[in-house]
């Protein structure tokens, strides 16, 4: 039968062939049995095989009929659907004829749709997919793409003949194929024709359809097409063209029923806008889509997304060629004309910049354009601009009820974000925030996104002045960053000039124009505008200034500038004088600018112009132009284009007599260059002299401007160039002409240098307005002096050098006594000579020719001192009854040991040098011995002295104790100087006892001798100490007395190293006063105990211990003094003379205190002493002598300090004179009288001077008269010695009178008298006393200007010319006289330079505590207090007393008395001084100020100080190698402050949180994490701090993940997300290992894993819904992607490169905007991160090294999208889908497994 059928098939008749197919079908059914379905496993019968074979026949009738037969078998249920379909698909690849097969597939699909769709009630879209169960047509097309015409034919028939009831199902079953055809990423060209042709078929209008709504089929097709649009590829020209056609066709179809398709039309309009941009970039054409948009506007009207499209149009216009602009302009006009109430949206102002760009370029472009119908581009642009300028704006922004979920390009995200930001920026504070953020990003941005330019232009056009200055600033900086948009901005600025504004704003806009000349291409445009302005006569001055500014940017404008300057010189009759004046000033200013900017290029060209202006402007009211050109000349001289001397020679005829203040000021500024341009020629030196004279003359000018300029110019000159001849006559001292100057010698050799004190006299001549300039001048003097300060001055000041300016007579005393000592043969004279030797023994130092000491002679000198020391220990006489010697003997030993120690030390070093020279020692060994020589000498002297005292008399032991105590002080000072030299602690030497232990041993020895019950803590110098078996002290009375008085020598050591001993010693000495239970049995010892306590207290006063100690120490001092005074005035006590002397010593030093309480106390006790003298007639002569001496000392000190008046002092002096007259043989009375006369004389008491002139000749006459009684002669000797200042050390008098030649003559006369007595007198006792007094006088004369304190109390050791010394003297005067006599304003002028220069230099040693304490306590005001503290702070490093005083003022109660500014300074400067005060003081400062200011409830709570406190704390924590205790305190303070900071962060307080983060930055990770641990109560501040640390790279990014688990449960998660967004962006900007791209990528991948765990509920959270938690985490993911993809999105969003833009809260007052992350701008920024995520993700994954992780990102997106339904909100799912679709340009997306999954197939 098969053969028969075959023959029928071959018969060429269609009827026969058709019948044959019927027979074949019947045969198939017969062979297979009618009851069984044909399926895959059915036996292949001949008939069935033939049927399949003929389906591919070349005969169209046969193959068609066979294919239809197969379909019929399926339809009649004789064959399985899958069997037939698969069979057909198997045939397709190999057959030549596919028509029948494809038609059969269509029929099968229609049948399947009918069967499965149930009449459209069931969705059958999922029957087929694209990949796993592919649609049959996809399979066919992939195998036979050449069959596309058959496809087109069959698909056309399929859709056109689709039964109405099957329309929905048919579209659903065809959907996978259509998705594949149009969305396949490769967009194969083989399918292109099918795509295009089929689209017309799909979208052709239905002939019979309802006018109101489309047919079901049309609805289904159009909805499918709308869904396809976001997946279209727009990468290249072909793809873009196809996509454009697709979207346009879809839009046209939608427009047939605009009401029905309103939402889709709106969305497609936006898609069309987006794809227009791509089309414009790739094809240069977009008019068709623009016309479509215009049609949509007409139909949609108010439903059209006007504002978004306006933004899009603005962007398009900026990049559209002229030929494409007309349609866009028409569209814009249409958009603005369809708005209701004729009110246009404010966003229309965005069009201003593009419109102006068109208008400004029309003339050129119209030349090359083809004539077109209708209005021209220019007319359209003008119409549009006119419409926008009507300012009839809608109040509200258009509300969008729709949003494109999946836009076809990234443009939509940009315009939507721009629209949202524009919406918020109606508030000026939000606009200011955005501008500040943009400004912060410009330095790191190379290309500025066009939307940002548009927004800026919008702000520029709209702003009425609130933010205009900021906008112009950002515009300028934006032009610097990206010059490509400058041509667009220039017309906007010109447009803004036409709007009504404040005049100053017009000026700002005009001067912004030249700043935009950042590229040569922009210059022409700007130049034309400026030239246009110049055509208006009134604007020519401004034009010249603008041209000059433009020239500063681009030198190529110089010819034009020159031309315009020349034109401006031409006089014009049409303008008034005012305009001419403006032109002249403008020209002068331009000359100045040219000279300043490019002096070498064009400076020479300006000389003629400068000369012209100077010649023309000579009138008083023409000073301004002349001054301006002189400033230009200043620049030329500075650049050395012209010679300043030659210039002045040329100008001086015109200007030397000029009196105009402005000219004089400018000339002074010009002359400030003279020092820096110095030339080594006589002419220049003469010129400099002339200039100095000019400047000094004008310092006294009545005009403050001139005087200020003169002083400021003088500050540039060297201090040595000023002479006393320059000073004003009123303060000019007499020229010192030396007596020895011969007549024929040159007078130029006279010293004309200015004494430092003379500069201070300028204060009295200087008006208040000139004081600041004088202050600058003083600062210059101080700085120069410190720069040139000899290094040796620091050491000599600490060691105490001898005065070098004493007369020859005084200098000859030591040699005289030494000679007497060496030639003496009288044993009775030996003790006296030894005493004299003690006071003044010294051996001259010999130097080689090159000025270096000779080692051999140094060694010899050291040996001489060693031998003399041992001799003096044995020979110096100690007599307990000699009260006068007891006072001075300790000081004599101290002075001697100072000389001896340094001489022996130098000798030791000399010996070592000799050993090295002779090769007796190795260099290393010698070096070690030299470094330890100071300790070797100490121990050698200690051994020698203790051995000498071992078995000798009590006198020797007493001398030894005084010598060792002095040695302790001397070595301690030497150690201090070594420490300052080595800038730190000295290295511990293992072979020597440490200084601390050695000093402790000496001290314990003294204390054990004074008090046998004292328990020493270490070893003792056992040679001295003998204790009986009963435990009683067996030391001699002399030893006990010497030990007690020696304690006073150690006061400087106590204060520096062991202040705690002071209380112990005071208590010990007080307990042993006469009349006390513990008083010594020996009467002499009781006397010395009182004296010792007085000496000890006086030394404490001298060291200003009360100023640098706490309240407890002051109370103890007063308590001890009270006890001493009680003994002094207790008439029942017999042995209280020592107490009287002690009180005298204390009161003498207390007089110099600035505390009113002390001064009152001194005055009261002085009167009490005076009365006591009156009542002492019945007392012993010694008692009376002591009392008189004490009264003289206290009276002198009180008068010198201004405590008593001259009359009261005179009364006391007369009282003592009467005592002397009544008892002329009493030495004590004569001593007292001589002392008071001397003291009052040097303090300016005229009557005392007169009395002294009478007393001295009388006493000398008594001494030199033969036969005078010895006692009378002795009294006269004491009196005349006192009369020339031998007792000055007791009172520490300071006076210039001591240095007068008159006084020097009296001193010489006394010395000659004493030497004559010693040489001639035959009375041993008289000789002995005379020698002792001569030595005593020598020592007191040498130390008259030196303090015994551990550091000098002033700078008298500096030369007379020292300004610093004079300034410190002024401090002292201020401290003594108070603000009534020394005005604070003048004191500030002197103090400020000292404080300012002190920041860079350490001053020579001085007792800052003594200087500054009075100024701090007296009412000088806040400014002086702060300057005092500044000096303490800067000098605390090198001055222990400055640090001690500072320690007092930074702790309660004194710190509470300081002003707010002073506290602020202390807080900020804490890092400079905090290491130099005690731990207790640091604690007090930290607790009572640094932390207290953060406590709102605290009385100290002060928000103004909080930033300063944290700044100081953070800087203090950066100090290198802090002590453990200090670090602990600072760390603890950081924790406390962090806890006190509010959780919600106010914008104005942001700096505090940054500062606390900087503190944590210095800590270890564990400490920082402990303090900033994130909890629910502190989450915002802790999160911010951690985020800041992460952004700076201090913490790794992984810390964020831990924080997120807490953040997700926070109610205001958005605030935290906003912080995270900024932190992540800043982490990208900061260059750090922890924020590098690999670290960031690692963290983001980890975060993605964490989010996956959350989505699949591997991680759960309490009190937070899963979908909300996932939304938050996806937001965080989005922030990271947007922040790290590029700089465009962050710039548009208003992200900042730092936190500073958010620091100032400049919005309207309100609780929400004032907090960080809560303002409308902040919220929009965060929301729009999600909008920009898709585009940012695509950008990120195209960069290295991110692109390597693309597959991981895609897989992750799929895993989250496919998470359980309840885990992901609809919005998040849409976002992730859009993100996936944005990746369709990537190679990884083109894998079928990826893109089919992404499209949902």
Swiss-Prot record:
A Pfam family reported for this protein in Swiss-Prot or TrEMBL: DUF3730
GO cellular-component term (any): cytosol
Primary site of residence: other
Effect of residue 1177 to R: In SCOLIV; uncertain significance
Residues with PTM N6-acetyllysine: 819
Disease field: Liver disease, severe congenital: An autosomal recessive disease characterized by severe neonatal liver cirrhosis and progressive hepatic dysfunction. Affected individuals have feeding difficulties, poor overall growth, and failure to thrive with signs of malnutrition. Additional features include jaundice, abdominal distension, hepatomegaly or hepatosplenomegaly, and ascites in most patients.
Subcellular location, record wording: Cell junction, Focal adhesion; Cytoplasm, Cytosol
Name recorded for this polypeptide: Focadhesin
Cross-referenced InterPro entries: ARM-type_fold, FOCAD/RST1_DUF3730, Focadhesin/RST1, Focadhesin_C
Keyword list, A-Z: Acetylation, Cell junction, Cytoplasm, Disease variant
Key word Transferase present: no
Oligomeric and partner information: Interacts with VCL.
Tissues expressing the protein: Ubiquitous. High expression in brain followed by testis, muscle, pancreas, heart, ovary, small intestine, placenta, prostate, thymus, kidney, colon, liver, lung, spleen and leukocytes. Expression is reduced in most glioblastomas and all glioblastoma cell lines.
Entry's Gene Ontology BP terms: regulation of post-transcriptional gene silencing
Outcome of swapping residue 1668 to N: In SCOLIV; uncertain significance
Native source organism of the sequence: Homo sapiens
Protein purpose: Required for the maintenance of SKIC2 and SKIC3 proteostatic levels in the liver. May be involved in the regulation of RNA degradation by the exosome complex. Potential tumor suppressor in gliomas.
